[in-house]
């Protein structure tokens, strides 16, 4: 299986994890095993558990991690606590999440994530459950608008949702290019003339809805944080503002000492921070990485201990 994946922000991730060769580590998003392999190579008596909900990724990661102290499990990272408990692992010394859609999922047109090639409108990372076509052909205009606005930050959400409802009344919307053309027809001409494809926010929003990505991230962060050993590190790579905002707010809450109202002059809560921020500001790709890996352009890495 062709599965190209250049790991984003690899060295900053390895530095952030502060790997102990005897430690236990979790990669919640195995993908093409780019990060997983480099983590596992640095372990001696330690162990790596790699998770991914995509069966294609699991097959590739299993092959690429052969001979290394690593185990791959097909599951969404929101189930990390359960998986670790079943494996008899009480805590991990570090965990990594590389969020969003993988290069393989984008490059494989048949998966239906890309608006650059015609394919069935699928977008399921796990290849199970309702597809993107199911959503766009069944949800009412109000719900479609909410998804496009909340998950895509799409300024023309109402107009696009209206075009989708009108188009599907004539024939089902079953392919990626069908949807991309509907979006293009719904936005003002000035939007269509811009360098970025006008469908990009719609595709992001529907993908997030199909895969419940923000719910999974919210639950997964809590689950993984609770599995960290004292001094354990959590590294999270985000690719859009919705993910990054969620991660930033979680990290800040965990690192916060006082929870008293801001107008209260003296602390009475006796709060103790659960963690400390290793990165006050997110780490982004340097010029060398940007030149060799286009996917790294929007990547932001945050690290917590």
Regions from the PLM with identified roles:
Residues 1-305:
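S-adenosyl-L-methionine-dependent methyltransferase catalytic core, i.e., the SAM/SAH-binding region
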